[in-house]
């Protein structure tokens, strides 16, 4: 049962994290009559602008997080970022709090160690070789064992922060320092993993719903500096490799438990599929589903967490997304060129309405459909390039 917002019968959902992905989740929640409460570390975040009300707290502060949940008494708590005091969610779940998909899933995936150990050591899934390191000495020893090239990442980071590829041992000191600067909760533990010379990487959006496990068509993407630049759907792959990918994704999602959409990241080399990471929430590369599917990843996530069925997912054909990435400093961001950006057929645009920029930041995404993937990607890139950001 779903009541009406601002009434005693309202179904209340609290978003922990109010960025562009949270904003789309909030929109889908409101389409089904759910009262939305936004929480983030800074004011006027994108989802806060459309939430019924919002709060600014440090979500890594366990006392502050518990206090805001006890104040609002949400029926659903929806973590949208990693930098959260997840142990508080675990404790409150035992007291009756409904965390999406589960508090355990949120805690395991908040850092790379929990999910990597689950996938490789508990589930026995194929992954790259890896070591976790607390000190620079351990870090250098791990590089010696794995060899170069290898990849280093903070165990807790997002959007590529702190990630680098070491192609020569002489780069190790710089890579260690960069990883220490890039962690979401400050410096600390890192993962060093073998570099898989993959043919391509995919995000397999996997939904655990009341009527079973569902998959979106595979999404291909291009990364740069650890963050996605373009994504496209469907990624071409053989039926055998797709089946292997779906089997891996199913095992991970079922092990994490709960209802919701999961972004499962996989590497493909020949006929081999390797597990990389998973997010128990919509994925940035999945922004392409805003134009490629009848139900976007956000709509699917909301259906699942509300206990509603997903009878089918229709994919419209070759589609792509390209980010609007800007570097600068301003608290008065404005946009020009929108008419040019939207002049071509089957193009859309999402501007995230982020309140400020200080450095490099993703401010929007261009979306496109076309006759084939290459054409769709080029159309999305062309659209994104025509958006002019004024400071």
Swiss-Prot record:
Pathway connected to this protein: Purine metabolism; IMP biosynthesis via de novo pathway; N(2)-formyl-N(1)-(5-phospho-D-ribosyl)glycinamide from N(1)-(5-phospho-D-ribosyl)glycinamide (formate route): step 1/1
Any one Gene Ontology cellular component term annotated for this protein: cytosol
Similarity comment: family membership: Belongs to the PurK/PurT family.
Residues that coordinate or bind N(1)-(5-phospho-beta-D-ribosyl)glycinamide: 20-21, 80, 284, 354, 361-362
Superkingdom assignment: Bacteria
Binding site for ATP: 112, 153, 158-163, 193-196, 201
Binding site for Mg(2+): 265, 277
Cross-referenced InterPro entries: ATP-grasp, ATP-grasp_carboxylate-amine, ATP_grasp_subdomain_1, PreATP-grasp_dom_sf, PurT, PurT/PurK_preATP-grasp, PurT_C, Rudment_hybrid_motif
Underlying gene: purT
Reactions catalysed: N(1)-(5-phospho-beta-D-ribosyl)glycinamide + formate + ATP = N(2)-formyl-N(1)-(5-phospho-beta-D-ribosyl)glycinamide + ADP + phosphate + H(+)
The protein's name: Formate-dependent phosphoribosylglycinamide formyltransferase
GO molecular function, one term: phosphoribosylglycinamide formyltransferase 2 activity
Keyword match Magnesium: yes
Pfam families assigned: ATP-grasp (PF02222), PurT_C (PF21244), RS_preATP-grasp-like (PF22660)
GO terms of biological process kind: 'de novo' IMP biosynthetic process
Function: Involved in the de novo purine biosynthesis. Catalyzes the transfer of formate to 5-phospho-ribosyl-glycinamide (GAR), producing 5-phospho-ribosyl-N-formylglycinamide (FGAR). Formate is provided by PurU via hydrolysis of 10-formyl-tetrahydrofolate.
Annotated ranges, domain ATP-grasp: 117-306
Record keywords, A-Z: ATP-binding, Ligase, Magnesium, Metal-binding, Nucleotide-binding, Purine biosynthesis
């Amino acid at each position: 049962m779903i009541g009406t917002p601002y009434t005693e019968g309202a179904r209340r959902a609290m978003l922990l994290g109010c960025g562009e992905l949270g904003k789309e989740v909030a929109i889908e929640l409101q389409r089904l009559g759910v009262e939305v409460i936004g929480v983030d570390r800074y004011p006027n975040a994108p989802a806060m602008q459309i939430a019924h009300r919002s709060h600014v707290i440090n979500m890594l502060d366990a006392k502050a997080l518990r206090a805001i949940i006890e104040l609002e008494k949400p029926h659903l708590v929806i973590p949208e970022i990693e930098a959260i005091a997840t142990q508080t969610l675990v404790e409150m779940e035992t007291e009756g709090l409904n965390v999406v998909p589960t508090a355990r899933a949120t805690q395991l995936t908040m850092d790379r160690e929990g999910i990597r150990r689950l996938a490789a050591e508990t589930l026995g899934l194929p992954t790259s070789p890896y070591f976790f390191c607390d000190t620079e000495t351990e870090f250098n020893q791990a590089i010696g064992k794995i060899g170069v090239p290898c990849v280093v990442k903070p165990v807790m980071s997002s959007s590529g922060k702190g990630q680098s590829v070491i192609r020569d041992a002489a780069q190790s000191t710089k890579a260690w320092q960069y990883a220490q600067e890039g962690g979401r909760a400050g410096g600390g533990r890192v993962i060093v993993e073998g570099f898989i010379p993959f043919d391509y990487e995919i995000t397999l959006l996997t939904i655990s719903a009341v009527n079973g496990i569902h998959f979106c068509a595979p999404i291909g993407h291009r990364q740069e500096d650890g963050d996605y630049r373009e994504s496209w759907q469907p990624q071409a792959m053989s039926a055998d490799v797709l089946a292997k990918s779906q089997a891996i994704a199913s095992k991970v999602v079922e092990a994490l438990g709960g209802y919701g959409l999961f972004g499962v990241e996989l590497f493909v080399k020949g006929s081999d599929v390797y597990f990389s990471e998973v997010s128990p929430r919509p994925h940035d590369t999945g922004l392409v589903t805003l134009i490629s599917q009848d139900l976007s990843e956000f709509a699917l996530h909301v259906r699942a967490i509300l206990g509603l069925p997903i009878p089918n997912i229709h994919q419209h054909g070759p589609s792509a997304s390209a980010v609007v990435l800007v570097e600068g400093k301003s608290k008065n961001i404005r946009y020009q060129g929108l008419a040019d950006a939207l002049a071509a057929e089957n193009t859309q645009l999402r501007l995230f309405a982020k309140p400020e920029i200080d450095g490099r930041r993703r401010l929007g995404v261009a979306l496109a459909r076309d006759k084939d993937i290459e054409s769709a990607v080029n159309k999305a890139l062309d659209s994104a390039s025509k958006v002019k950001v004024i400071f």
